[in-house]
Amino acid sequence: FEKKVLKDDELIFLAKKYKIIFDENAKKIYFDKDKIICQNKAKLDLFLRQNAKKIFTFYLKKWSKKTGLFYTHLSIKNMKTRWGSCNHNKAYINLNLKLIQKSLRAIEYVILHEISHLKFPNHSKEFYTFIEHFMSDFRQREKEFLS
C-alpha cells in the first residue's frame, strides 16, 4: 500500500496532482489547469466523496451487468491497508476513498477485482481467469495501479 508524500496544499484526483486553493468566495469547486479552487476543506472533502460515489457506482453497475454478479451495498471508507474488500456472503463491496486518486483504468480494475470476489472469495487461478475473461489487460492495469 503506497504512500505518496504530498504537501498540505496538494491533492491527487483521478491520477493528476492539483494544488489546492481555498477561496472563501468560491461558490463552486472548479479546476484551473493544475489547481483546484474551493471554499474550504469540508466542501473539498464532500466533493471528493460525492465524485468517488458516482464513479465507483458507475463501474460497479457496469461490471455487475457484464459479469452477472450483483452487489447489495457499497461502502466508501478511509482504509489504511486496502484499496477494496468484498463480503461475498452479504454481497457488500467496500472501497477505499483514496481510490479516487487513481486513474479510471485502475479504479475499474479494482472494482472488477472486488465484484469477482462475489463468485470467488479467494485469489485462486479461477478467480484471475474470470477477471481476465472480462478484462484481458488486467495485469497491465494492476501494474499501473501499483506503480
Which residues fall in each region the model found?
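Active-site-proximal or metal-binding-adjacent scaffold patches in catalytic folds
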Residues: F1-Y109, L118-S147
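Walker B catalytic acidic pair
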Residues: E114
